[in-house]
């Protein structure tokens, strides 16, 4: 996420390219620097060219997909990032040279690009089948984390003598008594729901959890870097079929494509060509040639994963 912040911070330069003219940007005892002089200097740099590329892309994306990205969608993503960083959110923004407003602007740009990918990428049956192999639907679990394996075994022994109807309440008591996870021990050990795409949980933990049916718990302690876990499955809808999860599988493939430079290049090329872009400054005529020259020969199809 921090890398993402830093990458977006560079886009803040976009404001410097707007409304260039004779107004003064800065003064010194050696003379003044006008907007036009600043523009002439900046446009010759790679950063300046990248900024103009982004400005153009934002314009055409907004025109083509603006009605598909709502204000609430931007706010939802913004709140997610804010929640991830908690009390350090403001400092991370500051270190990246961004404000809350500029972050929301770039979130919108990213969501617009995602709409373009969805519109220009064809997800094949083969890709759906491959994605389904590792797919697990969203599940809800509770866990008890302890530092010693013997303690976890004691908890499991207790659960074995517990009736199924009393399992959740007993697990809640044991979590409060034994768990070292302060964030969940007083909540019955319950974690936020997750699926196979979740990256916040230990892979060993997820693998053990996905094997459980609703109401089942791990028969042996699950060892991770944090200690030993006893996991109780609160709700597992089952894997089901590709047809049942086609929408979610497609979404996951599109999310993967958002990190695929080849797919993004081809999508941007199509979007720019459709945008009828015309560069008026002769010195910048070729800044989009890498995209526009390839748009007629490159097809935007989802990459094979």
Curated annotation (Swiss-Prot):
Lipid-binding residues (covalent, N-palmitoyl cysteine): 20
GO cellular component term of the entry, any: plasma membrane
Pfam families: Rotamase
Membrane topology value: Lipid-anchor
S-diacylglycerol cysteine lipid attachment residues: 20
Swiss-Prot/TrEMBL catalytic activity: [protein]-peptidylproline (omega=180) = [protein]-peptidylproline (omega=0)
PpiC domain sequence ranges: 136-235
GO BP terms: protein folding
Record has Cell membrane as a keyword: yes
Keywords: Cell membrane, Isomerase, Lipoprotein, Membrane, Palmitate, Rotamase, Signal
GO molecular function: peptidyl-prolyl cis-trans isomerase activity
Signal sequence extent: 1-19
PANTHER family found in the cross-reference section: FOLDASE PROTEIN PRSA (PTHR47245:SF1), PEPTIDYLPROLYL ISOMERASE (PTHR47245)
Function: Plays a major role in protein secretion by helping the post-translocational extracellular folding of several secreted proteins.
Protein family: Belongs to the PrsA family.
Designated name of the protein: Foldase protein PrsA
Species of origin: Levilactobacillus brevis (strain ATCC 367 / BCRC 12310 / CIP 105137 / JCM 1170 / LMG 11437 / NCIMB 947 / NCTC 947) (Lactobacillus brevis)
Gene: prsA
């Amino acid at each position: 996420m921090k890398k993402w912040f830093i990458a977006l911070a560079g886009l803040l330069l976009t404001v410097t390219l707007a409304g260039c003219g004779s107004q003064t940007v800065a003064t010194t005892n050696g003379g003044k620097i006008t907007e036009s002089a600043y523009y002439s200097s900046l446009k010759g740099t790679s950063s300046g060219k990248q900024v103009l590329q982004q400005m153009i892309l934002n314009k055409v994306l907004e025109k083509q997909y603006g009605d598909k990205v709502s204000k609430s969608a931007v706010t939802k993503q913004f709140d997610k990032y804010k929640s991830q960083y908690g009390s350090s959110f403001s400092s991370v923004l500051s270190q990246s040279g961004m404000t809350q407003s500029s972050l929301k602007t770039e979130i919108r740009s990213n969501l617009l690009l995602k709409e373009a990918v969805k519109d220009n990428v064809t997800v094949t049956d083969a890709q759906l089948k491959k994605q389904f192999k590792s797919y697990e639907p969203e599940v809800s679990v509770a866990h008890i984390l302890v530092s010693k394996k013997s303690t976890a075994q004691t908890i499991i022994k207790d659960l074995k003598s517990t009736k199924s109807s009393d399992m959740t309440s007993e697990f809640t008591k044991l979590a409060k008594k034994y768990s070292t996870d302060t964030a969940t021990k007083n909540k019955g050990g319950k974690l936020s729901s997750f699926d196979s795409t979740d990256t916040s949980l230990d892979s060993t933990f997820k693998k053990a959890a996905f094997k459980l049916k609703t109401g089942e718990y791990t028969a042996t302690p699950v060892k991770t870097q944090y200690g030993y876990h006893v996991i109780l499955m609160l709700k597992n809808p089952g894997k089901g079929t590709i047809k049942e999860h086609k929408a979610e599988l497609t979404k996951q493939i599109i999310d993967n494509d958002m990190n695929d430079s080849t797919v993004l290049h081809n999508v941007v090329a199509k979007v720019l060509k459709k945008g009828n872009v015309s560069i008026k400054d002769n010195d910048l005529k070729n800044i989009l040639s890498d995209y526009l020259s390839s748009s007629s020969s490159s097809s935007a199809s989802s990459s094979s994963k």
